[in-house]
Amino acid sequence: MTKVDFWPTLKDAYEPLYPQQLEILRQQVVSEGGPTATIQSRFNYAWGLIKSTDVNDERLGVKILTDIYKEAESRRRECLYYLTIGCYKLGEYSMAKRYVDTLFEHERNNKQVGALKSMVEDKIQKETLKGVVVAGGVLAGAVAVASFFLRNKRR
């Protein structure tokens, strides 16, 4: 895998391109034959899509990166990083974790990968905590309703 000294941060993924910029990337892919366009053109377009605020664009970006991952072994490292970001933005945290864990196995000393891994794990932890709180609230509500009915039944 080729080494890259700098990748965008998760924050960069939330700074969308202007529609005209995204259209230029799309036209480049179309002019090169769509699915048979160069890997670099498709990669650039996928990243532009992931940066979008439209969830359908983000999903298409993840799909394109998944295709590139499968066909270009030399780009797998980059794809894993960007797939992690794309899945994170889509709220697919378990997939983001799978991608970042795979990347981290090969990039243990890469600070950006480590930071991204920490962000994904923190988000999963927060989402799990929210789930526990919601479940606890539902349980408390069910107990309150049940006790209300039981009290009224005794009267």
Swiss-Prot record:
Localization per Swiss-Prot or TrEMBL: Mitochondrion outer membrane
CDD domains in UniProt: Fis1
Membrane topology, Cytoplasmic segments: 1-131
Entry GO MF terms: lipid binding; molecular adaptor activity
GO terms of biological process kind: apoptotic process; mitochondrial fission; peroxisome fission; peroxisome organization; positive regulation of mitochondrial fission
Domain of life, source organism: Eukaryota
Residues annotated as transmembrane: 132-149
Chief location category: mitochondrion
GO cellular component: mitochondrial outer membrane; mitochondrion; peroxisomal membrane; peroxisome
Topology with respect to the bilayer: Single-pass membrane protein
Keywords: Apoptosis, Membrane, Mitochondrion, Mitochondrion outer membrane, Transmembrane, Transmembrane helix
Mitochondrial intermembrane compartment residues: 150-155
Domain commentary: The C-terminus is required for mitochondrial localization, while the N-terminus is necessary for mitochondrial fission.
Family indicated by similarity: Belongs to the FIS1 family.
Protein name: Mitochondrial fission 1 protein
Gene transcribed to yield this protein: FIS1
